[in-house]
Design a protein with these regions (language model features):
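Alpha-helical transmembrane segments and their immediate interhelical/interface regions
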Residues: 1-15, 49-92
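Hydrophobic alpha-helical transmembrane segments
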Residues: 135-161
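Membrane-interface helix-boundary motifs at transmembrane edges
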Residues: 2, 29-40, 87-95
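Cytoplasmic juxtamembrane regions at transmembrane-helix boundaries
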Residues: 33-44, 165-182
Length: 182
């Protein structure tokens, strides 16, 4: 159910809930009448946000960048990705951002407790080559900054990328046959 590996692949986890809540919030907004009229453009923006984040991560990991340079690049790529997602569907992005913080703040707290208590779970596991820099710098680097700044971008981008096509399909199903032909 849980893993002691770094970034452990566990059945219990917050990441796998993102597509579910992306669909949930998108459908709720759709039924409330707050959805894009057309879905091609929002889908392109959402896909562009994901492509940017993936490309940025690839560059950061393959270039052997210093932590400060990676952090700076990651902030910039994250900000641009969030803007693209917000352009895709602003209210869905806001809902997913709020959900992202509501789900990630408790994770950061649990990770703090795990690191302090040495629980030997994925919450306190470090890469073998991670430098011995003390508790607070380690906590900020591996928990606080990722959970509070970067995982929300994942939540907004992936949640939107999953929610937008589902609502596009619902919109097509909702149309009457005469509207669909027009």
């Amino acid at each position: 159910m849980v893993s002691s590996d770094v970034c452990g692949k566990a059945i219990l986890g917050v990441v796998w809930l993102v597509p579910i809540f992306g669909i949930y919030f998108a459908v709720r907004l759709f039924h409330a009448g707050d959805a894009p009229q057309r879905f091609a453009r929002p889908l392109v923006f959402a896909a562009s946000a994901l492509a940017l984040k993936l490309a940025g991560t690839f560059v950061m990991e393959s270039r052997g960048m210093t932590y400060a340079a990676r952090l700076s690049m990651k902030f910039n790529v994250t900000l641009i990705g969030l803007v693209l997602a917000a352009v895709a569907w602003p209210t869905l992005s806001k809902a997913l951002l709020v959900y992202g913080y509501l789900s990630r703040i408790p994770v950061a707290i649990v990770q703090y407790l795990a690191m302090r208590g040495r629980w030997s779970t994925h919450y306190d596991a470090l890469d073998p080559g991670f430098p011995a820099i003390g508790f607070w710098p380690t906590f900020l680097r591996v928990s606080f900054v990722p959970n509070i700044f970067f995982m929300e971008a994942y939540t907004v981008i992936v949640g939107g990328l999953v929610g937008i096509p589902v609502v596009a399909i619902l919109g097509r199903l909702r149309r009457t046959p005469s509207e669909a032909q027009a």
